[in-house]
Amino acid sequence: MQTFNADLAIIGAGGAGLRAAIAAAEANPQLKIALISKVYPMRSHTVAAEGGSAAVTQDHDSFDFHFHDTVAGGDWLCEQDVVDQFVQSCPREMTQLEQWGCPWSRKPDGSVNVRRFGGMKIERTWFAADKTGFHMLHTLFQTSLKYPQIQRFDEHFVLDILVDDGQARGLVAINMMEGTLVQIRANAVIMATGGAGRVYRYNTNGGIVTGDGMGMAFRHGVPLRDMEFVQYHPTGLPGSGILMTEGCRGEGGIMVNKDGYRYLQDYGMGPETPLGQPKNKYMELGPRDKVSQAFWHEWRAGRTISTPLGDVVYLDLRHLGEKKLKERLPFICELAQAYVGVDPVKEPIPIRPTAHYTMGGIETDQQCETRIKGLFAAGECSSVGLHGANRLGSNSLAELVVFGRIAGEHATQRSLESAPANASALDAQARDVEQRLHTLMKQEGTESWAKIRDEMGISMEEGCGIYRTTELMQKTLDKLAELKERFKRVKITDHSSVFNTDLLYTIELGHSLDVAQCMAHSAINRKESRGAHQRLDEGCTERDDVNFLKHTLAFYNPEGAPRLEYSDVKITKLPPAKRVYGGEADAQEKSDKEQANG
């Protein structure tokens, strides 16, 4: 086993990982940084984000407005000091990306263009056509190449982190190209491994988004927080889960049922706004949890359209015109044509909700550090407390760079103040990781990782979907317990060294099963409806601030199901209130202004 000595190790080279690496390199030019990724950086899942990144930029917008939209959108489960820090940091990061070369779309006068996203009452989403994630990731990757102290380990799969005397001290990874192991020692480690959307059958996530970082931190005793909150995006393509960006609706797209009716006006997001009126009043720009829930009700009422790929509604962009679609949503036109054979210029796009984003994750403090000294987390794998029970669109790309920078700066400080590690203890841990890998490779079993993964995805969709019941969640919990037992009998049939995906998918599945259990156990024990967690059981259909205005913490239990604890939500300036959108929000805004003016 090779050994590489670094000061800081970063697991994941997407938006958060690259931003952390750049921040660390700028904080201390002498710092030796190891950047480990199981794919080439430009294949990280950040590249798939289409819509945009939030930051206050207009005169009629403010940090307070962004703060209010985020806290209300998260159904008051956000850590409000974290949200405050976030909204004030976003403009700096967007400007920094521009200075590094990110080609933000612009208005005719040359100023940065912004569009509105769901749940945001003011246009504040910066975008680069409909390939924002690609351009942000490319900009960060290009910028990272300026720093020779950042050493990349592309196509290296991290097997485990090393912890000595209560501090993260490195990791062990497998070089996928050669099949050899490498021990990377460091005084601090940052997890930037993305979410866990692949635990669901249909999802918008790339194949690499399997919850690896969450699973590793979890098994080392770090709790996973608020894992019951999994966002369904309302506009995925049927069958594939390919995302039709929220930017479609931000540009003025509408959603209709089989009767051509803009049905969202029946679910607290109306009244109907005539086409061509200010888009920030469009009912289609409600928060994602509520828009996805409206689809479920339309389906139950028989007002969706049946297709071979499942029931759908339509996303209609035709009234925007060919010129605007080709200029502002060119990638969407390509995707719709390629995956469902639809030209958005001429016909509506069939869509349905699909699993999209993990609001919960590795619990961290405001500096992105976990309960293990020197172990940090940033991006979708983390739970710093920003999103609460429902993330607003375009806050996630901004989160990557805001908290990627914070994690990089604080991990640098932690690394520099740390005493030397116990090398022999790290070597012993690394040998243990190697032995576990060999045991897995030689395991004589009868189970297939692919079959277990498929059954997990179906079960999670049935029990932990848009609407949940005790009965369905319990079935999912029972199924997951069965699958974890069967996982102990998985047989790896490929024993080659080079790009052994049979082995890698098996290891990923182990993490996914742990994460899925945390999601389901956290969900069945939250006996209320809040944000993306909606229950149909009697007594659980409403938000319950008295008993459940708190975070769920899932701790690893080697003997079975995760152990749950709860912690308070930090409320600093916006007390819990009813979430209102559409006409009801307009009426409240008018009333607030009248009261303010006496």
Swiss-Prot record:
Disulfide bond entries: none
Alphabetical UniProt keywords: Cell inner membrane, Cell membrane, Electron transport, FAD, Flavoprotein, Membrane, Nucleotide-binding, Oxidoreductase, Transport
Region (Disordered): 577-598
GO biological process: anaerobic respiration; electron transport chain; fermentation
Pfam families: FAD_binding_2, Succ_DH_flav_C
Residues the record marks as active site: 233, 249
Family annotation (SUPFAM superfamilies): FAD/NAD(P)-binding domain, Succinate dehydrogenase/fumarate reductase flavoprotein C-terminal domain, Succinate dehydrogenase/fumarate reductase flavoprotein, catalytic domain
Molecular function as annotated in GO: electron transfer activity; flavin adenine dinucleotide binding; succinate dehydrogenase (quinone) activity
GO CC annotations on file: plasma membrane
Subcellular location: Cell inner membrane
Keyword Transmembrane attributed: no
Biased composition (Basic and acidic residues): 587-598
Disruption phenotype: Significant growth defect during anaerobic growth on glycerol fumarate medium (a quadruple fdrABCD deletion); the defect is similar in strains also containing an sdhE deletion.
Subunit structure: Part of an enzyme complex containing four subunits: a flavoprotein (FrdA), an iron-sulfur protein (FrdB), and two hydrophobic anchor proteins (FrdC and FrdD). Interacts with SdhE.
Functional description taken from the UniProt entry: Two distinct, membrane-bound, FAD-containing enzymes are responsible for the catalysis of fumarate and succinate interconversion; the fumarate reductase is used in anaerobic growth, and the succinate dehydrogenase is used in aerobic growth.
PANTHER family linked: FUMARATE REDUCTASE FLAVOPROTEIN SUBUNIT, SUCCINATE DEHYDROGENASE 2 FLAVOPROTEIN SUBUNIT
Name under which the protein is recorded: Fumarate reductase flavoprotein subunit
Organism whose genome encodes this protein: Serratia sp. (strain ATCC 39006) (Prodigiosinella confusarubida)
Species classification: Bacteria, Pseudomonadati, Pseudomonadota, Gammaproteobacteria, Enterobacterales
